[in-house]
Amino acid sequence: KLAGMKYIVITAKHHEGMAMWDTNVASFKDYTGKTMFSLQQYTPFGKTGRDVLMELKTACDKAGIKFGLYYSIIDWNHSSQTINGDFTKMKSMAARTAYIRDMKAQLKELVDRYDPAIMWFDGDWTYRRKAPTLAKWWTKADGKDLYKYVKSLKSSILVNERVCRGFKLGDFECPERSIPEKAPSRPWETCQSMNDAWGYKKDLENSYRSYKYLIRELVDVASKSGNYL
């Protein structure tokens, strides 16, 4: 807040599929198919009954900081999909239909419970322009539909372009670890990490970017009317 932060985006579900809230959507179970794959079921923190997303949401509201949630479209753990490199492959078209339905149910949980100002999608890499296949199972039409669905849950929510990138969808552009030479025509942000990883990597724990590097990027982004996430 003192540094000028206006909003945050916290991971609700990343590619590995663990829900950081007490989801009730039945298909999001662990590899055994018996236990919900969530923070509440898998960690000592969650089993105390605490809700990390709500605690952070409450703190943001108190500080006047907008609260955003990150959600991955692909899910390495979900029974509908198999891991295909960094991507996933659908087991069948019926599984694809059911997964998209259940993904929307999780998104409704998140919007209803936490009232986020931003829904930040990722994991749309398997996209196609036209009809889906099992390997390229996400389409431009799916992205448009997902955007419309989230807006139906909360009309004022901001949604990034990664409902299906490359087609000018969503409310703002979000290049990753890069800054365009010229300011984009639409609202935009770029996302950056403090080191070369988006999560814990033992060999990178002490290789943080210098404050001069980060401030230089922040100034460059701000000079082009962007946000620095």
Predicted regions and their residues:
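Mature catalytic domains of secreted/periplasmic carbohydrate-active enzymes
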Residues: K1-L229
